[in-house]
Amino acid sequence: VSKSHYFIINESKEHSWKVWKDCGNNPIYPQGGTWPYDRAGWCPGTRVDEEVFELTYLVNPGQTITFDYEIEKMSDNTEENGIYRMSHQLFSFGPPNFKRNLELVDIINPSSKDSYSRINPTLGKARVIVKNVGSENIRRIKFLYGLISGKMSTFHWRGYLKFLEKSIISLPLNDWHGLKDDKRFFIEAVTINGRKDEDYTDNKIISEVQIPQVLPESFVIKLKTNNYGRSRQNSYNISDYNGNSFYSGSDFLDSSNYDILIQLENGLYRFVFYDSNEDGIDRLWWKEKDSVGISGELGFYDVEQNPLKVFPPDFGQEIRMDFIIGPIP
C-alpha cells in the first residue's frame, strides 16, 4: 500500500513523498512468481527508487540542524513481517560552475538499452531526459535531432527548470529516411534561453536505433483467452504515431479463441494489448498452476497461419510492439 514518507528538519516536516512503484511494466520479464505486483519503492530486478531534495534554503553555514524520518502509519497488518530498508546520503557542494548548463542525461526513445525495452523499438516521438546543472533557471531550449547522416529536425521547447531539476521532454516526429543504412540517432541542445550553453560537453547524446519488426500488409492476431472472468481484463489497440486508431477490441469471452484479420497500408504502427489487472494472461503463476485456470495465448501470424511474433503470456500490465508495414525507411 502506498505510504507517505517524511523528512523532518528542525522539528518541521519539510519534505514528503509517496513510496510506491508500479511493477506491471517491469522491463525484466517474464520472471515467474509475483513480479508484476506493485511494491514499496522497488520491483524485482530493477533499481530502488531514489528521492532527492534540496536543503540549501533551510540551513546556514555553521548551523547545527536535526533530522528525523517518519513513515505514515501502517493500519493493514496482513504483511506483518514487511519492513523498509533505506539509506540516506547528504551531499554538500559549492556554487555551480556555470550559469547556463543543461545536461542531456539519457535518450529513452529510441534506445537499445534493456531498461527501456518495454517501450522500444520505436520510430515514434523521441524522448530525452534533461537536467539543469547551471544556476540560471531554464525556460527555453532549442533542440536539433535525427539520424546522424539523415535530415535534421528542430524543436523549440518552453518550460521551467530550476537548478538540479530533471524533466522528460518529448520531441515531434522526425524524418527516418536512411535508417536502413544508419541506426545512430542523436539529440543536441543547441541553445539555452536563446544563448549558447557555457559547458558544451554534455549537450549532445547518441543512441542506437533498433528497427521495429516488418509485418505483411495482412496478418492475423491470434488470441486465446483465460477463464474465471479474466478475459474481461483484456483489450487491444492498433494505431499510428498520430494517434489514429485502426483496430481495437475488448469484451472478450472466457476460454475462447479469436482470429482477428488485420489489413494495413504501408506505414509505422503501434500495437498495445492491455491487461487491467496487470497480471498478464498466464495462469496465476507460482503455486498449484493446474488448479487456477488456463493460460492465455497471444501472437501475430501470417494468413497461412505461420507465426510472425509470439508474445509471452506472463507480461504483466501490457504488451507494446511497434511495427512497420512496407519497406524500412
Predicted regions and their residues:
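Surface-exposed, short loops/turns at beta-strand junctions within beta-sandwich domains
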Residues: 58-61, 175-182, 264-265
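Loop and turn regions of beta-sandwich accessory domains that flank beta-strands and are enriched
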Residues: 27-52, 57-59, 73, 208-328
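Extracellular/luminal regions of secreted and cell-surface proteins that mediate adhesion/ECM remodeling
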Residues: 70-218
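Extracellular/secretory-pathway and virion-surface proteins
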Residues: 1-100, 108-110, 117-122, 133-136, ...
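Beta-strand signatures of extracellular beta-sandwich domains
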Residues: 6-8, 142-146, 235-239, 299
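Solvent-exposed serine/threonine-rich low-complexity stretches and specific carbohydrate-binding patches
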Residues: 16-28, 152-165, 171-173, 247-254, ...
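Short coil/turn segments at secondary-structure boundaries
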Residues: 20-21, 142-143, 285
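Solvent-exposed strand-loop boundary residues in beta-sheet-rich modules
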Residues: 11-13, 147-151, 193-195, 242-244, ...
